[in-house]
Amino acid sequence: MRFVPALLAALFLCCGAQAATAPKIGITSLSEIEVPDAPFAVGANADADVDAAFARARKDGKRVLIDMGGNWCADCRILSGLMERPELHAFLAKHYELVTVDVGRFDKNLDIPARFGITTRLEGVPAIIVATPAGQIVNPGRVSAIEDARHMTPQALADWLAQWTP
């Protein structure tokens, strides 16, 4: 009987907390999304933007979601449009400090993924890095998992983004 509390503690530590459930997305097709023309600020100072996101994350106890892509990329623009939908935007703002980084045609701001040990060419975009406020990557090996965003449902994309919440 004295082992029950220890067993419960061990189960909690090994299983961890569950991620937050993604909001229900009010559309079923990505064709219903208003797709922005240029969601990535081409001349932005990505290093400063990412540093500021981490400063806010440390203050607010949130994770950082770094959305890397380019304005030429249809999947990147579709994902950006989905993330602006009110139901998903509110969810993301509650759980993450969101920052967008223009990687051009895989030739700009590559020092950002390098901060997290990604020193080879990105597999595709959009590429999403989720990190703790201390800078520890949470989704290693899954950074380019939604590079084919246009072939996913809006709900599947929201669920993918939600799985990395604390």
Task: List where the protein language model places each region.
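Bacterial N-terminal signal peptides
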Residues: 5-16
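Thiol-based oxidoreductase modules, predominantly thioredoxin-like and allied folds used
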Residues: 88-110
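Structural alpha/beta surface segment adjacent to cysteine/selenocysteine redox centers
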Residues: 104-125
